A protein has these predicted regions:
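Active-site metal-binding core of divalent-cation-utilizing nuclease and nuclease-like domains
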Residues: 1-28
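Phosphate/oxyanion-binding active-site loops and adjacent basic polyanion-contact surfaces
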Residues: 3-8, 45-48, 115
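A short, structural micro-pattern
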Residues: 4, 32, 84-85
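Conserved catalytic cores of phosphodiester-cleaving nucleases, focusing on short active-site segments
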Residues: 10, 34-42, 52
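Short His-Asn-centered micro-motif
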Residues: 38-43, 70-74
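C-terminal tail/extension regions appended to the core domain(s) of diverse proteins
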Residues: 64-67, 72-150
Length: 150
């Protein structure tokens, strides 16, 4: 059997041992079921966005409860539509464009600082996801909504 694996920069999940027995052969492998996956980039541009979007879709097809986040220092996007992807959020941690990064480097200036408020927001987003109750029938009857995603 084939187990597709994908390296992610950061994953929170559960490690499981999977054993498959067929035709007198036994296959065993450790797999990680992700609940949070974060891809880290120096900057995000269209090709990287497309790649991350595809990865987010594949992960969520196996684990719909997983949130997929891209944490990038700089942005190199123009008219792309990241909101149409399965990426839950893209953080631009320096709140600056890639061209600003390159200009600072060329001018021998310090790099942009990472915004600590965004780091706290990222932490709280993950904490909220991990602490959420994903399915509670009594709550659905109270709100009248079952999925209730933001």
């Amino acid at each position: 059997p084939y187990f597709h694996s994908k390296d992610q920069d950061f994953v929170l999940g559960v490690s499981l041992g999977v054993t498959i027995q067929a035709e007198e052969k036994t296959y065993s492998q450790e797999i990680i079921i992700p609940v949070v996956a974060i891809e880290c980039k120096t900057y995000i541009e269209r090709n990287m966005l497309d790649s991350c979007s595809g990865t987010a879709s594949r992960i969520k097809s196996a684990m719909p409860y997983c949130i997929y986040i891209v944490a990038s220092e700089y942005m190199k996007l123009k008219d792309e539509l990241p909101e149409l992807s399965n990426i839950n959020e893209i953080y631009i941690l320096c709140k600056a464009s890639n061209s600003e990064r390159l200009k600072n480097r060329k001018d021998n200036l310090d790099p942009h600082k990472i915004d600590e408020v965004l780091i706290i927001d990222l932490f709280n987003k993950i904490k909220g996801h991990l602490n959420s109750i994903w399915w509670q029938p009594s709550k659905a009857l109270e709100t009248g909504k079952i999925i209730n995603r933001p």
